[in-house]
Regions:
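Active-site acidic/histidine clusters and adjacent loop/turn architecture
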Residues: 49-114
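Charged, low-complexity, helix/coiled-coil-prone segments
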Residues: 23-35, 86, 123-137
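N-terminal module-boundary/linker segments of secreted carbohydrate-active enzymes
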Residues: 23-67
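Bacterial N-terminal signal peptides
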Residues: 8-19
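Intrinsically disordered, low-complexity boundary segments flanking structured domains
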Residues: 40-48, 108-110, 128-133
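Mid-length scaffold segments of soluble, non-membrane domains
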Residues: 97-98, 113-147
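Bacterial N-terminal signal peptides that target proteins for export
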Residues: 1-8
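Catalytic cores and adjacent binding grooves of peptidoglycan-active enzymes
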Residues: 127-129, 139-205
């Protein structure tokens, strides 16, 4: 019996080591293959940032079915290490993320990316309904599970993406919203701990 238990314990430890070794949390200068995908999409003509200002991240994550993936993200180099830290902690906690693809897979269409519940960072674009550049244009903002955590314009009631309307209202008391980010949520706490501000607290929109 002791031998059986010992063998079983060894197998468990081996499996844990395999899982740990499969984790990917890396930061790179923008590879040529990624740069080619970005040009004319998330990095259009006239973008004020330099290629050297940006970093390409590969990040392990767990989806809402518990399946593991390696996602892709482009961000400003100033926050690359912060994002590695945050998403490693989210992965370790098995915090679910629906999708993490470059917004270039959606032709840099923010609405399509959000409707697909895609977590992303850099995209050189204007704030919706404004001439001002978005913080995403500098690679300094991250949308996490944006379908479940839509942007709600306080003044007009407009919801982006529109597909997220079902998750937009009565959020404080509702328990049926998957991946809901609020001030008690791990995702919120990790981002705030690294100096980020939460869009859910904005009142100027």
């Amino acid at each position: 019996m002791n031998t059986v238990r010992y063998v079983a314990m060894c197998l468990v430890l081996m499996l844990q080591c395999l899982v740990l070794s499969a984790q990917v949390f890396s930061v790179h200068e923008i590879p040529d293959s990624i740069w080619t995908r970005m040009l004319g999409r998330s990095y259009p003509l006239g973008c004020e940032l330099q290629r050297s200002d940006l970093r390409y991240l590969e990040l392990s994550y767990v989806d809402f079915e518990g399946q593991e993936h390696v996602g892709q993200m482009v961000c400003n180099r100033q926050i690359a290490d912060d994002l590695l830290y945050i998403f490693r902690r989210l992965y370790e906690a098995r915090y679910p993320i629906a999708s993490m693809r470059l917004i270039d897979d959606f032709d840099a269409d923010d609405s399509r990316s959000m409707a697909a519940n895609n977590t992303s960072c850099f995209c050189y674009r204007r704030v919706a309904g404004s001439t001002a550049l978005s913080k995403h244009s500098r690679g300094m903002a991250v949308d996490v599970n944006p379908l479940y955590n839509p942007c709600v314009y306080v003044r007009s009631g407009r919801v982006l993406p529109p597909e997220g309307k079902a998750y937009a209202h009565d959020r404080e008391r509702r328990k049926d919203i998957p991946g809901k980010i609020d001030t008690a949520d791990l995702c919120y706490r990790l981002f705030v701990s690294r100096g980020f501000r939460w869009g859910g607290a904005w009142r100027s929109l």
